[in-house]
Amino acid sequence: MNILTFDVEEWFHLLAFDNTRTEAQWGKYEVRIYENVDRILDILERTNTKATFFIIGWVAKTYPDVVKKIAAKYQIGSHTMNHQLVWQQTPEEFRKDVESSIKLLQDITGQPIECFRAPGFSIRESESWAYDILADLGIKYDCSVFPAHHAHGGMAGFGAPVPSLIKHGDVEMKEFPVTTKTILGKKIVFSGGGYFRLVPYRLLKSWSAECANGYANHMVPRIWHDKAGNVVMGDDGFPVTRNVGYLLSYIHPRDLDGGQPMLEGLPLKRKFKSYVGVKGAAEKLRYYLKDFKFVDVKTAADNICWEKVPVVTI
């Protein structure tokens, strides 16, 4: 079960960088969202691939035509309104931010917004209150868990990086964590962001194939259908399932933009992480989507037997 996601931001939406931290600063930068989104849509069309797009509310407010173009064929999710880290907000601020983004996206697209991803995977164990708010706002699927250490968040103790039910009090949230692979004792997220750009394609393909085939027994209970497409039910009253592997990839439009300007004032390490491999990443994605079949979050969720997935209590 391979899932493709995009975090739709402008090229300057880097987290924890003072020069681009607030909305008041964003208007002075070059607009690249049109060509960057068109590049993605062209690749998806040519490879017949479905994906989920997590869109910042600011992008939707500023460029509603871009959002409408995406929503014509693809699932839309919220990436908050103003791209701020969750752990830097109070619960009240977080609710207001997410609620405004959901309303805006629903008004523009006519779609129910049922999917969410936090900027920088910034829901940690200490921000578990966020799940109460997300559920209250109608979110059914979350893609915010980074099951390793991360500069902006992460849940290193999450458990196996597979679809799970997060339980927080009376709330249950269907969670799609980012895929990880352990290399020399360290968990790395190779299928998205900087690692996607950095890792040579042969290695990316090899690691992805391992995960898609059930790396380290990280499996998903996929619902079994008969030849007519009907769900096959077992004697226990639950759907019959077959365990399959799991791979989730996340890409930003700027990851594929080889012509973007370089932001001034970035530390050397951050500059490397932000721009390494951007010139060849679009071509790499084309190969990736030809070698692996991906679906969007909703399609994946509809094909999982959630009664049989791990339960993670936070």
Q: What is each stretch, according to the model?
A:
Residues 11-16, 184-186, 257-263:
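Short acidic/His/Gly/Ser-rich catalytic and metal-binding motifs that mark active-site loops
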Residues 24-31, 54-56, 82-94, 119-122, ...:
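The substrate-binding groove and active-site-proximal loops of carbohydrate-active enzymes
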Residues 37-41, 64-68, 98-102, 131, ...:
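Generic structural signal for well-ordered alpha-helices
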Residues 46-48, 198-232, 243-314:
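C-terminal domain-boundary segment and adjacent tail
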Residues 47-127, 139, 144-152, 171-183:
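Metal-dependent polysaccharide deacetylase catalytic core of the NodB/CE4 family, i.e.
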Residues 111, 118-236, 240-244, 249, ...:
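Active-site-adjacent pocket scaffolds in enzyme catalytic domains
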